[in-house]
UniProtKB/Swiss-Prot annotation:
Function as written in the Swiss-Prot or TrEMBL entry: With S4 and S5 plays an important role in translational accuracy. Interacts with and stabilizes bases of the 16S rRNA that are involved in tRNA selection in the A site and with the mRNA backbone. Located at the interface of the 30S and 50S subunits, it traverses the body of the 30S subunit contacting proteins on the other side and probably holding the rRNA structure together. The combined cluster of proteins S8, S12 and S17 appears to hold together the shoulder and platform of the 30S subunit.
Protein name: Small ribosomal subunit protein uS12
One annotated GO molecular function: tRNA binding
Biotech / industrial applications: One streptomycin resistant strain of S.coelicolor and S.lividans (K88E) produces increased quantities of the natural antibiotic actinorhodin; strains which are resistant to multiple drugs produce more antibiotic.
Sites bearing 3-methylthioaspartic acid, chain numbering: 89
Gene Ontology biological-process entries: response to antibiotic; translation
Subunit structure: Part of the 30S ribosomal subunit. Contacts proteins S8 and S17. May interact with IF1 in the 30S initiation complex.
Source organism of this protein record: Streptomyces coelicolor (strain ATCC BAA-471 / A3(2) / M145)
Domain of life (superkingdom): Bacteria
Alphabetized UniProt keyword annotations: Antibiotic resistance, Methylation, Ribonucleoprotein, Ribosomal protein, RNA-binding, rRNA-binding, tRNA-binding
One Gene Ontology cellular component annotation held by this UniProt entry: ribosome
Gene3D superfamilies found in the cross-reference section: Nucleic acid-binding proteins (2.40.50.140)
InterPro entries: NA-bd_OB-fold, Ribosomal_uS12, Ribosomal_uS12_bac
Length: 123
């Protein structure tokens, strides 16, 4: 516990909150160009081939972004929209690609949670 004199001299220091999506620079989304599309394996208890893409954003920063949903049409030089949101079992992946916008197509035959995957309503 500090003395009053110590508080007069130094004062309390505010806690600094760490930014979870620094590459977006305060924007809700950012456009970018895919430089590499590949698959990675998740951390220990899980096993899969997760689809990810290396994306160069308009802010000039290159990030790794997850491609959600089943199947995708992305390849090198595809223009994508990136949002924040990490993937818990992929270390270093702190961004997600928005399906159904720019060059990214929505998920086919999606019945539930369609808006998250850019899927149109079936007639």
């Amino acid at each position: 516990m500090p003395t009053i004199q110590q508080l007069v001299r130094k004062g309390r220091q505010d806690k600094v909150e760490k930014n979870k999506t620094p590459a977006l620079e305060g924007s809700p989304q950012r456009r970018g160009v895919c430089t590499r599309v590949f698959t990675t394996t998740p951390k220990k208890p899980n096993s899969a081939l997760r689809k990810v893409a290396r994306v160069r954003l308009t802010s000039g920063i290159e990030v790794t972004a997850y491609i959600p949903g089943e199947g995708h049409n992305l390849q090198e030089h595809s223009i994508v929209l990136v949002r924040g949101g990490r993937v818990k079992d992929l270390p270093g992946v702190r961004y997600k690609i928005i399906r159904g916008s720019l060059d990214t197509q929505g998920v086919k035959n999606r019945k539930q949670a369609r808006s998250r995957y850019g899927a149109k309503k079936e007639k």
